[in-house]
Amino acid sequence: MADVTTVADDEAQIRALIQAWADAVRTKDVNAVMRHYASDVVVFDVMPPLFVQGAEPYRCNWQDWFDALEGPADFQFVDLHLAVSGDLAYCFSVNRLRARYRDGTKHDAQTRATVCWRKIDGRWLVVHEHASVPMPVPESIAA
């Protein structure tokens, strides 16, 4: 018999996965972070390079960033929206991240994120992630 779930079930599963991902970021657990990504994920991150294709290269980005931090990260969703339809889902959010780098520099930033999920072999996995920060513009064009 096929696994039949309701949209509410899928939404609850994804919300639990999102929370587990955030907990893994807070504790800098790269293995737990990477459990959420499809092997062929495409990521547009706020840090170079312009994009990353594949979970293994993205793992390196996470590990390098975690290694640069002193202590845990304070990560919070300021606003999170989720929609599910069939085997696809997306969420978007504004996120707040506070951390301290090993050189003593403090990091306190808000980012915008869009994450696309696909149910693959019964598991919800991230297939695309896009994070961005507002870009400063000259005052003459800022409305």
Task: Label each region the model flagged.
Residues 2-35, 42-143:
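A beta-strand edge to alpha-helix "cap/lid" segment located at domain peripheries
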